[in-house]
Curated annotation (Swiss-Prot):
It is found in: Cytoplasm. The keyword Cytoplasm applies. UreD, UreF and UreG form a complex that acts as a GTP-hydrolysis-dependent molecular chaperone, activating the urease apoprotein by helping to assemble the nickel containing metallocenter of UreC. The UreE protein probably delivers the nickel. Its main location: cytoplasm. Belongs to the UreF family. This is Urease accessory protein UreF. It holds the Pfam family UreF. GO terms for molecular function: nickel cation binding. PANTHER family: UREASE ACCESSORY PROTEIN F. It comes from Bacillus sp. (strain TB-90). It comes from the Bacteria.
Length: 227
């Protein structure tokens, strides 16, 4: 139980990783009136989950966990570099880097482990960029949480943060936000099964539409979010 409670802490949208500052391109769709209410946001976030989250952070999280199972810590830095290089939008790329660096610093204090200390040192030495998916996987492995639970929790944490940002950005009501989190759970369960079967070569295979929205975000006249 204590292990799960520790993992829940990382999934809390109040965990100060900086995720509250990022919409990952969804703000572009809000300003263009593609997203206007609960249903349009739910549709958009479902596309984001299926076409981007599964193939980037979700797959990286499970690959990082498997690398530690195989005692291949050097693979974590390789994954870190692939995640950074495959992120086309500058705002999203730098946002993920800042969030990863911040999360690594917090977790090395809260849940220290030799692997996390080494990864954090690599970030400090500029030999790694930092990414929350890798930090989350390291902490989950250290806590001896199962691989499937780890990736499911990581997907939920990402979606929960985006829903909270939608409450502010669209806006939608808090109750509608919680309804989305309930309604989206079958998709996240599907995601765990899907990601478990993806090869490493699929890492970064995302929808260009989402990437274009993330790049266009840089030129919006008014922005609530950093990406």
């Amino acid at each position: 139980m204590n292990r799960l409670l520790s993992l829940f802490q990382l999934c809390d949208s109040n965990f100060p990783s900086g995720s509250f500052s990022h919409s990952f391109g969804l703000e572009t769709y809000i300003q263009e009136k593609v997203i206007t209410d609960k249903e349009s946001f739910k549709n958009a976030i479902s596309v984001y989950i299926r076409k981007q989250l599964f193939f980037t952070e979700g797959l990286a999280c499970i690959l990082a966990y498997e690398a530690m199972e195989k005692n291949e810590p050097s693979a974590l830095v390789e994954l870190d570099h692939i995640l950074f290089a495959s992120n086309v939008a500058q705002e999203t790329r730098s946002g993920n880097q800042r969030m990863g660096e911040r999360m690594a610093k917090l977790c090395v204090d809260l849940y220290p482990s030799p692997i996390l200390i080494e990864y954090t040192n690599r970030i400090k030495e500029k030999k790694a960029y930092g990414h929350s998916a890798i930090v989350f996987a390291i902490v989950a492995y250290h806590l001896k949480v199962t691989k499937e639970t780890a990736v499911g929790a990581y997907l939920f944490a990402n979606v929960s943060a985006l829903v909270q940002n939608a409450v502010r950005g669209i806006p939608i009501g808090q109750t509608d936000g919680q309804r989305i989190l309930v309604e989206i759970q079958p998709l996240l369960e599907e995601g765990v099964r899907t990601i478990s079967q993806l090869p490493k070569e699929d890492l970064g295979a995302v929808s260009p539409g989402m990437e274009i929205a993330q790049m266009r975000h840089e030129r919006l006249n008014v922005r609530l979010f950093m990406s």
